[in-house]
Structures are given as C-alpha cells and as structure tokens.
Amino acid sequence: MATTNDLKNGMTLDLDGELWNVVEFQHVKPGKGPAFVRTKLKHVLTGKVVDKTFNAGVKVDVATVDKRTMQYLYREGDSFVFMDTETYDQYHIPAQTVGDAANFLLENAEAVVALHEGTPLYVELPAAVELTITYTEPGVQGDRSTGGTKPATLETGAQIQVPLFITTGEKVKVDTRTGEYLGRANS
C-alpha cells in the first residue's frame, strides 16, 4: 500500500483488480481547496491510456511486477516459448501478449518479460535490433538522389521501409518500437 504522494513514473498500480502503469503524474496544490494528483495511466494489457485524478494522500495498491530477462526459444502454435535465463523455466506466452514484438523476435534472442503473480503481462525488446533483409527490389539507377524508400522483408517476415541503396542480404538496424529503419548494422 502506498499513497498518491509516492507515485513515480513507471510504477504499476492495481486499481479495481486491473493493472495500470503510471505514464506521468503531477502533484497539484491549488490556491483554494485540497491538493490532488493528476495522473496519466496506461492499462498494462490493452494499452489504453486514461487520465485519472486522485486526492492527495489517498492509498493505492502497488502491484509487484517482476521483469525478467528471458530467451525466446521457438513458436508453438499460437504461443511463443520463452526460457528464464536464471531458472531455466519455460513460459508459453500467447501471441496477443507478445504483440508487435513478434515482428522482431528471432530464435535465441533475449527479451524482458514482465510477470505479475507468474502471469506474463508484456514483452519488451531492446530499442533496436539487427536483422537481415531477405528480400527487397533492386534500387533503380536514377532514383538514388531522391532519398526515397522501398519495401523490404526481414528475416522474421516483417515488412519495413528501407532506403533505395539497401540490397537483399544486408543486415540493418530496426527500431522495435516504431518498426523504422535506423541504418546499416555494424558488422
């Protein structure tokens, strides 16, 4: 149990049996009336963002979320199998929990899995990953100066936009949050 005065960004709260991450908060002390805390909360499972105001000093439940480094092993039907790198326990995580991270997951890649009471909540990948281009159209000779882009398929099957000079077989850096091309990988 904590009070609204103890809130910090990134904290996970248990409100009415649902888990919410504190995205931002602001303690407000108006000239007239009691102080209050204005927060922006993000639902852990759905990603829905809401604004919620608490009176200052109100008790809130803080959920314990355990973030563990795990290794992605393989995909089995509708779930992804991860192994805890410390205990070697295997977790079958549903595809909807993995979400967009599935587009950038390679076998044996490490990711951070957030667990609440043994239940996986979400999967966090590093900000950027290096992946190989498996297919892209060759760049047209006259198009190089325009700075245009073309679609490319990654080894995970995901499609991204890359500059015209990138060819099949090259390793590129991709932002896992936006799916954007960041540059060639340093090999």
Swiss-Prot record:
It is found in: Cytoplasm. Transmembrane segments: none annotated. SUPFAM superfamilies: Nucleic acid-binding proteins (SSF50249), Translation proteins SH3-like domain (SSF50104). Pathway: Protein biosynthesis; polypeptide chain elongation. GO terms for cellular component: cytoplasm. It comes from the Bacteria. Keywords: Cytoplasm, Elongation factor, Protein biosynthesis. GO terms for molecular function: translation elongation factor activity. InterPro entries: Elong-fact-P_C, NA-bd_OB-fold, Rib_uL2_dom2, Transl_elong_fac_P/YeiP, Transl_elong_KOW-like, Transl_elong_P/YeiP_cen, Transl_elong_P/YeiP_CS, Transl_elongation_fac_P. GO terms for biological process: peptide biosynthetic process. Belongs to the elongation factor P family. Involved in peptide bond synthesis. Stimulates efficient translation and peptide-bond synthesis on native or reconstituted 70S ribosomes in vitro. Probably functions indirectly by altering the affinity of the ribosome for aminoacyl-tRNA, thus increasing their reactivity as acceptors for peptidyl transferase. HAMAP family: EF_P. This is Elongation factor P. It comes from Acidothermus cellulolyticus (strain ATCC 43068 / DSM 8971 / 11B).
